[in-house]
Amino acid sequence: MTTFAPHRDTVEFFVDTMHGGADKDALSGILAEDVVMYGPLSDEPLTGREAVLEAIRGVGAAADLTYKEVLSGQTHHAAYFRLQIEDTAVDGMDYILLDADGKIAEVTIWWRPLPSGVQMQRHLAGLVGMQPWELLTHTQ
């Protein structure tokens, strides 16, 4: 029999909160104090509740975010979403690890396709204090 990671309700609450405008107080209650976020906006992870909240709220204020599905595995949960700003859209996944208290301890975020992901990062970089990227292609 397959067992699943506990506290799926935390991830479902996270998704509901993001759909509701990323309320800071609600999110604070489900993020661990030392939460780490690995994401597509920067090469370096964001560490700590306040830094992660700032990034989440910046993205939530600027983009149309729609979560499609929450998946649960043996040790992690994942939330599949679509993120859009103007004519730039990416499909993505939040890969979430919860601590023993059921709080979000680690989030890794992936976006695709790459060209749209780079364009999305350029839309959001200034909002969260990151350097905008540029996609360079090699032609022969």
What are these regions (language model features)?
Residues 1-140:
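C-terminal and inter-domain tail/linker signature
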